[in-house]
Amino acid sequence: LSGVESVSYGSDNPSSGNTWSSNFALGRGSEDAPVHTSLKFCDADYFKTYGLRLKAGRIFQPGDTLGELIVNETMLRKLGIHDANEVLGKPLRLGSQQWHEVVGVVEDFNSHSLHNELEPITMGSRKEFYNVVGLKIRPEQMAATTASIQQLFDATFPEQVFDGQFYDESIAEFYRDENRFALTCKGFALLAILISCLGLFGLASLMAVQK
């Protein structure tokens, strides 16, 4: 489809709020304290599709062994490292047996709402955890391309229901309750203003009668 700029596969989108988690320790010593981190799984095109920028190192490559990891800046700080290049090639230990090599550092991004603190995030490329297809669509072809994607999906998977969602819509869900509260507050404010106006009108009428 000409309207699609890039396609990626992943366990979820960057700000879905739905993540696995685990504990990783830096180095091979048993004395290294593990860091609790959220886990995301994605392919190499994930970073381009969602606009995630690398701080150091590289993204995943076809020849990787699936043991390579990319961490965010917050994870880097939790590991006690301040230079992004310093962690490249270092082993991260999962449990007591599994070793993984850090090949890249990605700039911090919000995986939840802006009310949540930035959290440590570790990213791997294991395909068995891919649940979501992400597509970056050219804005000027948005409507036509979206319709074509749904038609293609329905023709390929006739027994499945197309469940597509724009990225900004998924982010907006974080603030749905706040928007409802804001609308309620506006209603109360309007009511309060109206009551105040009625009160002023009544006072003015009373003063007019007294005169």
What are these regions (language model features)?
Residues 2-177:
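Mid-to-C-terminal secondary-structure elements
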Residues 73, 166, 185-188, 198:
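Residue-level recognition of transmembrane alpha-helices
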Residues 176-192:
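N-terminal membrane-entry
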Residues 198-211:
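Intracellular coupling helices
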